[in-house]
Amino acid sequence: MILEKEFMREEVVLYARKYALTRNPLFYTFEGIGGNCTNFASQCVLAGSCTMNYTAVYGWYYLSINRRSASWTGVDYFFDFMTTNQGVGPYGRVITISEVQPADLIQLQNSEGRFYHTLVVTKVEDGEIYICANSNDALDRPLSSYDYASLRVIRIDAVRYDTRYVIDCFEALYSPPVELPQNTPQSEAPSESEPAPEEPSAPTPPAQAPTEPTPPERLEPPPSAPATETAPASPTSPSENEAVQ
């Protein structure tokens, strides 16, 4: 049976602040092959929903570097899933910047019309919006300090879940963080002269109907999860179709 539950906005903010300047070792870090911002945003949304969508190609899930959906790490794919999802998992809509609240998600657009960065709102105070992000790392950074041409805001309304597969994800999500090297840049805005890197390519979808995978410990998906995706043995270079910062 498919039911709906509340999207836990407080958990999103807590997770965002905890891992803005560190990394959760349960998830691959994409800095070296494009950028980690949408991967980080997906983790934050997972903290507020504890529900993935394992639909092949069009779902929203992460099992490993080569077993993930395009929507987990790609700016535009993330937007498309969150604003059009009719199945299990979080779902939402586009709102105006004047409506923004903590746990909303902001995506920045450059002067060429490309959305390149995903931010997690953690505070709205005295007319200023504060965000957390990865690559470049930011902890409660003012949105006004970013240089961008335009933006769009995603509001997650609720979460659909299958009552057969109710999983408590918090023990896994709140693993000890991995500290970053001290010389890792933090809270630096991408500039137009140095275009933001794009998101690494998503794995190729399975050629036939998926079967149950063997997921990481403590993050067991339902039997509908995809089996093995055709993907390179090591992370590949970013493509023009998946943008991130």
Where in the sequence are the language-model features?
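N-terminal capping segments
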Residues: M1-T73
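...with weaker cross-activation on analogous glycine-rich loops/strands in unrelated enzymes
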Residues: Y61-N134
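Terminal transmembrane helix and immediately flanking juxtamembrane interfaces
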Residues: V94-T96, D137, S145, C169
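A broad, low-specificity signal marking well-ordered, structured residues that form hydrophobic/aromatic
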Residues: V12-L14, I129, L151
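Short, solvent-exposed loop/turn and secondary-structure capping segments
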Residues: Y54-V57, T118, L143
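Short loop/turn segments at secondary-structure transitions that flank enzyme active sites
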Residues: A47, T51, E125-G127, D137
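Catalytic alpha/beta core of large soluble enzyme barrels
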Residues: C132-A133, D137-Y148
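Low-complexity, Gly/Ser/Thr/Pro-rich intrinsically disordered linker/tail segments
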Residues: S144-P223, E229-Q245
